[in-house]
Amino acid sequence: QVWRVNNFDTISLLKACNQGCKYATNSMESLYPHIKSKDLRKVIDDYNTQHIEIGDKCHEMLNVVHADEKDPKPMASMFAKMSIDLKMLADSSDEKVAELMFDGCNMGIKTVGKCLNKYTSASGGSKGIAKDLIDVEKNFANNLMEFL
């Protein structure tokens, strides 16, 4: 597959998708200790794997043009982890885990959707990855509904 990847919009979109995948996997992994239901754990495991796979695709495409990945800012990651930990202190139920993940899905859909609208000159391959990520977020949210 040939990508027209060497332009600002393509690189920016791939970095945004990659960063979003990292935020998602970091959040899922920080919630693992709180999950009691095997069914919820399986859903989260499945979608964690899908986020890792999409992040890997972004990484591969960014490597083609020697562009660095965009990691979540350390302070933002620390704040997100602390926020999750505080929310789980107040309510450590599987319902709360599902609610936090559901909110994250909606944030991901909104953020990646905005990036798709902003980076209109991005390559078809990078737009495809962004759309795949949005689909993963929508499906994840739908699968979380039964745990809310």
Please report, for each region that a protein language model flagged, where it lies by residue.
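Generic structural concept
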Residues: N18, K22, Y32, N48-I52, ...
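A structural signal for well-ordered alpha-helices, especially hydrophobic packing surfaces
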Residues: T25, G55-L62, S83-L86, A90, ...
